UniProtKB/Swiss-Prot annotation:
Keywords: Cytoplasm, NAD, Oxidoreductase, Pyridoxine biosynthesis
GO-annotated cellular components: cytosol
Compartments, record wording: Cytoplasm
Chain sites annotated for binding NAD(+): Q127, V128, D147, T176, D233, G258
Positions of the catalytic residues: R209, E238, H255
MF annotations from Gene Ontology: 4-phosphoerythronate dehydrogenase activity; glyoxylate reductase (NADPH) activity; hydroxypyruvate reductase [NAD(P)H] activity; NAD binding; protein dimerization activity
Major subcellular location class: cytoplasm
Species this protein is from: Vibrio parahaemolyticus serotype O3:K6 (strain RIMD 2210633)
EC number in record: 1.1.1.290
Function according to Swiss-Prot or TrEMBL: Catalyzes the oxidation of erythronate-4-phosphate to 3-hydroxy-2-oxo-4-phosphonooxybutanoate.
Protein name: Erythronate-4-phosphate dehydrogenase
Gene3D superfamilies linked to this entry: 3.30.1370.170, NAD(P)-binding Rossmann-like Domain
Entry similarity comment: Belongs to the D-isomer specific 2-hydroxyacid dehydrogenase family. PdxB subfamily.
Gene encoding the protein: pdxB
Length: 377
């Protein structure tokens, strides 16, 4: 049995080698010839699974993407060909939410505001958006959500119409898939009209898909230099990056918001377990068994936390400025976008750290944010 695995998928080689011969490949440059005599294909979001790619896939029976997003896969085509498909919904929701929170925290420091005084508008209330909503509300931050699909499906949460959310939110963060068709397409959801209507004190974060925001219109909006702030983890034509847009952004990173070690381990184990089920194999893997101990597994609090403490403990685990600085330094080099993804550091989630303090430390909201907590006597 031959299994192609994206070379950027952690723990995949050791897991899938239990099932057959593993062939590691760079996901963005896979060709139809690569899939000749291949039984299974394990990918990430950079691999476009379409008619061209599988045109010579004479043995392919299983495709798994270790990502929550699935818009890079022609699922109807795979179904037509009798090829089983699976994804890893929710695997990276924590990492993406913590990326967005880091952007908020750092901008709060830089611009001199409190996140607790702001309204955060979340567009897209799927796995990521819903998790971010839970975290922010658990911290006592005012949140608005928009998701017409969830609303129409009878989701009991209170949804805000898009135009109202955009007008009422101080921070707008995007967590939608990319779609061009249907009742609620998201391609250029944030277009020239929306961007020109944004106030100078508003912040836009895109950690969803690049084309959700019209990057040319965003560049023109940022050129007004009226205080409007934008942070992008995804770009409309990535891996190509508009080098005129880059200096206008508060933060820019190479599609790594969901690249935390826990999220990648979850994605790998989810599709490994699905493939084992497909093969009627009893092997199973658990992400927690693969992860190393965090560099700083425990932090002690000696008093009730305040916003400064929150800044310190969250940034100790993940500070978006680290990725932003590397991106600006390296992006002009050939192939840099994918190299930064390939060589991404072992970023951890808040859950890798236990906060220890007594009852006066008010640890419960920090648990809502994702930290493990331990109340000392």
């Amino acid at each position: 049995m031959k299994i192609i695995v994206d070379e950027n998928m952690p723990y995949a080689e050791e897991l899938f080698s239990q099932l057959g011969e593993v062939i590691l490949k760079p996901g963005r440059t896979l060709t139809a010839d690569d899939l000749i005599d291949i039984d299974a294909l394990m990918i990430r979001s950079v691999t476009k699974v379409n008619a061209e790619l599988i045109s010579k896939a004479n043995k392919l029976k299983f495709v798994g993407t270790a990502t929550a997003g699935m818009d890079h896969v022609d699922q109807a085509l795979l179904k037509e060909k009798g090829i089983f498909f699976t994804a890893a919904p929710g695997c990276n929701k924590v990492g993406v939410a913590e990326y967005a929170f880091s952007v908020m925290m750092v901008l709060a420091q830089q611009q001199g505001f409190s996140v607790f005084d702001k309204t955060v508008g979340i567009i897209g209330a799927g796995q990521v958006g819903s998790y971010l909503e839970k975290c922010l509300k658990g911290m006592g931050i005012n949140v608005l959500i928009n998701d017409p699909f969830k609303q129409e499906a009878g989701d009991p949460r209170s949804f805000t119409p898009l135009a109202e959310l955009i007008e009422q939110s101080d921070i707008i963060t995007l967590h939608t898939p990319i779609t061009k068709d249907g009742l609620h397409p998201t391609h250029h959801l944030i277009d020239e009209k929306v961007l020109n209507g944004l106030r100078g004190d508003q912040i836009l974060i895109n950690a969803a898909r690049g084309p959700v925001v019209d990057n040319q219109a965003l560049k023109q909006r940022l050129m007004k230099q009226d205080g409007f702030t934008a942070a992008l983890d995804v770009f409309e034509f990535e891996p190509e990056v508009d080098m005129e847009l880059l200096p206008l952004l508060a933060f820019a990173t190479p599609h790594v918001a969901g690249y935390g070690l826990e999220g990648k381990a979850r994605g790998t184990t989810m599709i490994f377990n699905s493939y084992c089920e497909f093969l009627n194999n009893e092997l199973r893997a658990h992400a927690s068994d693969l992860l190393p101990t965090a560099p700083v597994p425990t932090m002690m609090l000696d008093r009730a936390w305040d916003e400064a403490t929150l800044h310190n403990i969250t940034q100790l685990i993940y500070d978006v400025r680290k990725d932003d600085a590397l991106f600006r330094r390296e992006i002009s080099k050939p192939g840099a976008f994918d190299l930064m993804r390939k060589n991404y550091w072992d970023r951890r989630e808040y859950s890798a750290v236990t906060l220890v303090g007594n009852e006066t430390c008010n640890l419960a909201p920090l648990a809502e944010l994702g930290f493990q907590i331990e109340v000392s006597q």
